[in-house]
Amino acid sequence: MPAETVDLIARRRFSPPARRTQERAGNVSGLFPSRKMSVTIPFESQIELGAISLMEYDAGVVEFYDQPAPAFKLSYQTRSGRQAAPFHTPDFFVLRTDQAGWEEWKPEDQLRKLAEKRPFRYQQRDGQWICPPGAAYAARFGLSYRVHGKNAGKLQRSHRDFLAFSSDSGRRAQTRENKGLLLAVDTIKARETWEAVV
């Protein structure tokens, strides 16, 4: 891995969030107590809460950081042909067992509106949402840039179901000797629950 990439990842890991989360009318905000990260992680939408829950219990996620600093420029063409280069802070910087990079989590309907308004920034290809300028920036460091489009209603129901069986698992963990097996079973259940949404 190039030294520049190692330095970038280190700065993402040890820098405070680029901005504070904001409360918005009609949205859900709060703090998620993460055992994986040993901190409370703020969220400002149901989508972000679902993303945090998923990454918290995903064995393939090593670490994840909200509102990763510093912000960076996204260069793309607007609908009018003008060149835009706004500073941008993705929702998360995620270290996975097979890759590392930035991630955006947005409602599906919001992504469709953004793609119509900024077609060179958000696009859908083969059913997957992408951000070409974000991917271009990440590629400079050998990293990834992922865009997750979610149905808010399905995500909310799945999150509620997920918390229900997670709480049950916590109680059973106190009576089982083989906690490793329990964790493996719960990880499979978590993936099955969330794959219905992804």
Where are these regions (language model features)?
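Electrostatic, structured charged patches in enzyme active sites and in nucleic-acid/phosphate-binding
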Residues: M1-V198
